[in-house]
Amino acid sequence: MARYIFITGGVVSSLGKGLASAALGALLQARGFTVRLRKLDPYLNVDPGTMSPFEHGEVFVTDDGAETDLDLGHYERFTGVSARKTDSVSSGRIYSNVLEKERRGAYLGKTIQVIPHVTNEIKDFLAVGEDEVDFMLCEIGGTVGDIEGLPFFEAIRQFAQERARSQCIFVHLTLLPWLAASGELKTKPTQHSVKELRSIGIAPDVLVCRSEHPIPEKERAKIALFCNVRPDAVIPAYDLKTIYEAPLAYHRAGLDQAVLDAFQISPAPRPDLTRWEDVMDRLENAEGQVRIAVVGKYTQLEDAYKSIAEALTHGGMANRVRVRADWVDSEKLEGEGAHLLDGYNGIIVPGGFGERGTEGMIAAAKYAREKKVPYLGICLGMQMAVIEGARNLAGMPDAGSEEFDHEAGKTRFTPVVYHLKEWVQGNYTVQRKLTDDKGGTMRLGAYTAVLVPGSKISEIYDGALEIEDRHRHRYEVDAKYRDQLEAAGLSFSGMSPDGRLPEVVEYRDHPWFIGVQSHPELKSKPFQPAPLFAGFIRAAMDNERLV
């Protein structure tokens, strides 16, 4: 049965609980343990699938089609363990499950209350798969004291109480603010955060203290005394140049040892951190630099493209080169022109929804095609590349997407991209209507693409004729225009196994121009970069040498 580590936060949000959880999972793996990481989000949305990227950041999609928090991306990148639907839950999902059970009569006429019905639902979620791994790391979103988070804190308190003391521990992440006027770190916010946590029945075993300045030993001792933890369980967490330094930094600070001590695991297996030392070597000793323009709709918030940013870093590691990614607002291209892309060694157009900014994406695809600049179009980025080719090469000047017509409420375009109403998933066929609810109704999760032998995409994947990547879309390039587009030079080099859905397009006469309907960035890891991103950066390096 798994040991449980509950990671909570206090003082302020966005302190890095997700990264701390991912780094701790990686450190436990380095000691030979198996791990799984989970995220419990107190917001009332059922999942983040319908939330604005400006509100929530990226939606991370799992192999089995769950739309989850971007922290699950950190979990996967650091541990290599593929997340599942059962690794992410929100208050909305919990309450939805409880109400569905009430309607079915599952509670036998009882009055439904937060305790025990909601807390029991949360505990049932925590217990799924507990026999599969050595450690289950569960991050609670938000901060202690948030009203919407109280049922989760109560549930983990009960969960720990119902198990042996040596089976559950609590790690609490707090902030030590620096007061410039007095030139000192202040521990009082941490003390009050722990006081708040203890008031709901949870006593932290390990404190992780975020700080911009070194934490003196006397301050660590003071925190330990007032918060009732061991001095060596007060772990400093400083700002780092790269998130991939976190496992090594937390190991030096003693986080993994403090956790094992709290579980009374002795002697603790020695860690093998070779993998992370190699990652840092590739980052710190990179030679040269390539400049990449990411032309998107949500560039004001980099977290909206978190996996893109990390996959570019991984591609740089694979080629031992630094990647400088600039976030270019696609609407700005519409107003100021594609000359804004001059000087870049590669262009990425990532996914998105809605018509806003898409003419700028189309302009970026045209610029890359005509200037022979490496281009990677992802999801919407592939669709915009197809529309650009249809308009300017295949004699369809009014080519566009049904998505834009549906948004405007009138027909304006020849729909080379159409609303996907049916597709094969496993052994059955999924059917969708335009009037369906938005949440959870897209083509989600891992799907196979069958590749054309000898195509560039096949070469990138070492000659593979089938690849599998994750998807998140409800619009698709219409295969009925395939012959017309291929005659214009745009090759359909990857299709769904039934031959109905285009998965990959590429230009035969271009050094490197590929569009994919999937999201290969979601499976990229620092020690296993996504082949498409490694190949894209390699092509950008070739372009840099030509400039």
Swiss-Prot record:
Organism, as annotated: Paracoccus denitrificans (strain Pd 1222)
UniProt xrefs under PANTHER family: CTP SYNTHASE, CTP SYNTHASE-RELATED
Residues engaged in binding UTP: 13, 186-191, 222
Positions of CTP binding: 13, 146-148, 186-191, 222
GO cellular component terms attached to this protein's record: cytosol
PROSITE patterns recorded: GATASE_TYPE_1
InterPro entries according to UniProt: Class_I_gatase-like (IPR029062), CTP_synthase (IPR004468), CTP_synthase_N (IPR017456), GATASE (IPR017926), GATase1_CTP_Synthase (IPR033828), P-loop_NTPase (IPR027417)
Location of the active site: 379 (nucleophile), 519, 521
EC number(s) given by UniProt: 6.3.4.2
Note, other: CTPSs have evolved a hybrid strategy for distinguishing between UTP and CTP. The overlapping regions of the product feedback inhibitory and substrate sites recognize a common feature in both compounds, the triphosphate moiety. To differentiate isosteric substrate and product pyrimidine rings, an additional pocket far from the expected kinase/ligase catalytic site, specifically recognizes the cytosine and ribose portions of the product inhibitor.
Annotated binding of Mg(2+), by residue: 71, 139
Catalytic activities: UTP + L-glutamine + ATP + H2O = CTP + L-glutamate + ADP + phosphate + 2 H(+); L-glutamine + H2O = L-glutamate + NH4(+); UTP + NH4(+) + ATP = CTP + ADP + phosphate + 2 H(+)
Protein name (database record): CTP synthase
Region (Amidoligase domain): 1-265
SUPFAM superfamilies: Class I glutamine amidotransferase-like, P-loop containing nucleoside triphosphate hydrolases
